């Protein structure tokens, strides 16, 4: 009897859309969000004002970071309060000696553009 191999597109989709998660993390790090939240939890409105974020995409951006496990959230929309997840707090807060976000800054500023232009280059 012949065994059929199960074909699954999940790897294709995971890799093909992997930049969604990557760019979300890189952007939050570049903005200093994790350092801001390392001081104390903040409401979405406070984060918007302190980092100059556009209100239209504010909660989508913050909640994407919650879904990815980089932030914690209590409440919803205007009552939301955000804080760093444990690993984000330890490794992505510039005020801590354990900060390793510099490699993410380099990836965002230097490497991401190279990969973005891969087909021309």
PLM regions: where:
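N-terminal accessory segments
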Residues: 1-121
